[in-house]
Amino acid sequence: MRTCSSRPLVVFVSLLALNSCDTRPVNPKIDQIDTHTGYRFETRQVYREDHENLVILAFSGGGTRAAAFSYGVLESLRHTQLVGPGGNKIRLLDEIDVITGISGGSFTALAYGLYGDKLFDDYEQRFLKRNVQGEIFGRVMNPLNWPALWSRGWGRSEMAARIYDEILFNGATYADLNRGTGPFINVSATDITNGSRMGFNQSLFDILCSDLGAVPLSRAAAASSAVPVVLSPVTINNYGGTCNYTRPEWTQPFFESSDAPRPAARAIRELNALSDYRDGARRPYIHLVDGGVSDNLGMRGVLDALEILETFHDIGAPTPLDRARRIIIFIVNSLSTPPTDWDKHERAPGTLQVLVKATGVPIDHYSYEAVELLKDTMARWRMMRELRNSPAFTPGRDPVADAILRAPDAEIYAIDVSFAQLKDKNELKYLNKLPTSFHLPSEAVDRLRAAAGKIILESPEFQRLRNDVGATIVQ
């Protein structure tokens, strides 16, 4: 009898032992860099036919709220066609060149990059209307998974990545993403050691002497959405210094002078921070958390690129975007501001409430500043062009004035797709109450999708774009 009664315990312990063998995926090392291969913006240019317009979508963080809202933007662009003066119809969705994604927005960005139009067949059922949060919690609470969670380097985020892979990405890696012909997808996480923004693209992985192509998309999404404390950091290996990496030629002007060119000062600081990865012996591991910690809008890379573009124009150097006439940026911000009644009570809010608010407020303020910086850049370029084209200005008379007014010719369109742009105050109130989680009611998902399309069509900046290109909208 004693033998029979102990059998379940033996089986249970055996299963625990089997499950304790989980180890985190290791990004492979490369011995030599080839800048003409791998998943990077430069190699994706072969699929671009329209060099006059650069269309960028920036998807913010915010759990399923962000994933659904950004998906609504894709749906709207899918069903919106611009009809040019010649009668040719252009689907806005096909004009997208770059999508940046943070946290919840990274899922929609990566999934669209992988599946293209097929995403519209089942994204709702596979992800948006699924209790992803509950599935993660269920596995964490399953005793069979505890040994894996206790093992070195394999935490809750690795378990979440496995779930993301099962329900959405089907084992796809960046090599699979690179085989597609869609827009360049750049999702970001945050290096918790120094606070740097780390994008999942081969140009950055060159510094690590690592092959991004072997990295599962699910791990990139897990890193980008690894909310501190709630989920564990995602660890990647750094082999920097072992593959003869050198800085790209275009960065040399920024490092040859001790006085950083003003427009690109922030971008240069970011480049310097990334250069720190070249010493893999000193920093063999990089621990990544939610991308929203460093850039919740996915706009930092866009702003850096514009600043560098402006700096190149200042020094009279050519850039890959010199042919661009328009830079069109959809800032898809799912930030919600749930109302509180704290100020109506003498008793202060609890510790947990204060902690959540204290971490969110700086991120929200930084997001606001990022949008304003973009608008400042847009206004500055326009002002310099107007001065340069003014009858009062004579080119060649004053070299200093020529240099100051040497602004990029491209017109920037900053289309703000955020809850605050909704004219329906009742709908705004509803969306602002939605939590940041990976489980929302189906009704909430549908209303988020519908709101995104409505905001775009009613946007004054979108109407300006439509008028400037002389196109009409067909839905």
Residue ranges and their predicted role:
Residues 4-5, 20-475:
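Catalytic domains of lipid- and phosphate-ester/thioester hydrolases
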Residues 1-9:
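Bacterial N-terminal signal peptides that target proteins for export
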